[in-house]
Amino acid sequence: MTRPVVTRFAPSPTGFLHIGGGRTALFNWLYARKHGGKMLLRIEDTDRQRSTQPAIDAILDGLKWLGIEWDGDTVYQFARAARHREVAEQLLAEGKAYRCYATAEELTAMRDKARAEGRSKLYDGSWRDRDPSDAPADLNPTIRLRAPLTGETVIEDQVQGRVVWQNENLDDLVLLRGDGTPTYMLAVVVDDHDMDVTHIIRGDDHLINAARQKQIYDAMGWELPVMAHIPLIHGPDGSKLSKRHGALGVDAYRAMGYLPAALRNYLVRLGWSHGDQELFTTQEMIDAFDLSAIGRSAARFDFAKLESLNGHYIRQTDDQSLVTLLEDLLHYVPQGPAIAARLTDTTRAQLLQAMPGLKERAKTLLELLDNAGFIFADRPLAVDTKGQTVLTPETRALIGRLRAALEDVSPWTAANTEAAMRTFAEQTGLKLGAVAQPLRVALTGRTTSPGIFDVLAVLGREECLSRLADQAA
């Protein structure tokens, strides 16, 4: 009987949930869901100096926002230190590990010598078979794995293929430090085994760890999980991903106005493909996802492509949901509190009414919010630099005449205000654009906005006539 699929996402809480970590979590989640299994979450908080509660909170919040729900309780690695020590002691008792009393100075000398000779194996194994009676009384030993000296350690990786290491080049890795704390290598193996993890899907920067961890599995006689080391994410120029490329936390993408569904769709296509398909519903991702379709080459992050995809998702989202998403965004942007203070039943209704025009122009929720600024603006409007160039003495006089032409419009609708403006343009011999642009600046403070007649309808008669009066000569 085959074991049920269990994957895991195991971040270190030393910072935010990186975009690469978000993709790793997504791949683990998709694989587990496709096979009717579970994805577990383990917080690898053994680095007590760098692990922080705010980072843990950011990871949990980021996963939830992305729509990645893990199964069962969150496991905290540090809390399992006693179990990790128990395994190290078992290996010691079985002769598969040994106490190493090398001093810091001796270890430094070994490393320097190995590097000078071009050897990757840095520890010389001097305490591997040494008589324990030689041990200095004042030094707490580390516990090292008695790794094989000959032969090969082989990983049949689902992405990288067959990967082989010569054992003569691998150190006897430390399992327990001198102070009794377990190392990352030991803790990961013990936790994955105890959590019944069947598939380890992680970045290929962990590939060298796979060889060392397999040696622990072998020493314990445990079954090695299936491994899939996925390529890292690079910038558009092929260099290591940096902040200028998009190496930000998932929380930053939320604050920049990306929809979780759009970011999920973008991330799944970074390194994985399903024919030429670009757009996926969540269920389509689950149905199609397969480790064999992950490439070995580094994926390239393209902000323009993400923006375009996000714009598509915004246009496909219903108007009421976008209003809700905008309200949520206010918690994460500097101008949020000021706009939130202006949110009333009236402005919410105006936002909903304006949404069809707003969402056609926006690639992010932040752009959408910015374009909706005219709804929340105080009188008299702050007019931007481009708008100021439109407001000449002549156009201010024109605005006064426009206001008079609009006063008798009833009922106040986009169609009726448009008819009044077209009549005004014909009577004055002006092109509609020459009428619309001063009107736009007077009502929004900008030279760009949603359709001007939609703006008139959204703001309503009283507000429009008041704003026009503010700017009229």
Swiss-Prot record:
It is found in: Cytoplasm. The keyword Signal does not apply. Coiled coil: none annotated. Keywords: Aminoacyl-tRNA synthetase, ATP-binding, Cytoplasm, Ligase, Nucleotide-binding, Protein biosynthesis. It catalyses: tRNA(Glu) + L-glutamate + ATP = L-glutamyl-tRNA(Glu) + AMP + diphosphate. Its EC number is 6.1.1.17. Its main location: cytoplasm. GO terms for biological process: glutamyl-tRNA aminoacylation. PROSITE patterns: AA_TRNA_LIGASE_I. GO terms for molecular function: ATP binding; glutamate-tRNA ligase activity; tRNA binding; zinc ion binding. Pfam families: Anticodon_2, tRNA-synt_1c. A motif ('KMSKS' region) lies at residues 240-244. ATP binds at K243. SUPFAM superfamilies: An anticodon-binding domain of class I aminoacyl-tRNA synthetases (SSF48163), Nucleotidylyl transferase (SSF52374). A motif ('HIGH' region) lies at residues 11-21. One of its GO terms (cellular component) is cytosol. Catalyzes the attachment of glutamate to tRNA(Glu) in a two-step reaction: glutamate is first activated by ATP to form Glu-AMP and then transferred to the acceptor end of tRNA(Glu). Monomer. Belongs to the class-I aminoacyl-tRNA synthetase family. Glutamate--tRNA ligase type 1 subfamily. This is Glutamate--tRNA ligase. The gene is gltX.
